[in-house]
Swiss-Prot record:
Task of the protein: Binds to DNA and alters its conformation. May be involved in regulation of gene expression, nucleoid organization and DNA protection.
Domain of life (superkingdom): Bacteria
Cited NCBIfam families: DNA_YbaB_EbfC (TIGR00103)
Gene Ontology molecular-function annotations: DNA binding
Pfam families (alphabetical): YbaB_DNA_bd
Protein name: Nucleoid-associated protein P9301_00191
Length: 116
């Protein structure tokens, strides 16, 4: 019988096991995200950018025939590609985090486990 409203020893042991597994899985996920290359393209595909699953910029590609476009068009396309890559990267990260924590009801601050 657990006293003072504390969980019994078996529940506590199980909670520690889950926490340790989450920690190991989180490290693995962090490594996976770091090694991902997520591509974003401008609408006309003249600019492509790649960022990691951790939203770090990796590389940029500009179609050679696009280099003669006006400055504003180039800037607009770069921004489009960056936004798309960032959106894909953050979506991927959220999905992977949900896979990691979804069934555990952790109620992490700033993270909705029911958000899909």
């Amino acid at each position: 019988m657990a006293g003072f409203g504390l969980p019994n020893f078996g529940q506590l042991t199980e909670a520690f096991k889950k926490a340790k597994q989450i920690q190991q899985d989180a490290q693995k996920l962090q490594d996976e995200l770091e090694n991902m290359e997520i591509e974003g393209k401008s609408d006309d595909e003249m600019i492509k950018v790649w960022i990691s699953g951790n939203q770090l910029p990796l590389k940029v590609e500009v179609q050679e025939n696009f280099l003669n476009a006006d400055k504003e068009k180039i800037e607009q396309n770069i921004l489009q590609a960056i936004k798309k890559a960032h959106e894909l990267s953050t979506t991927t990260m959220k999905e992977r985090m949900n896979d990691l924590t979804g069934g555990l009801n952790l109620n992490l601050p700033g993270f909705d486990n029911n958000d899909s």
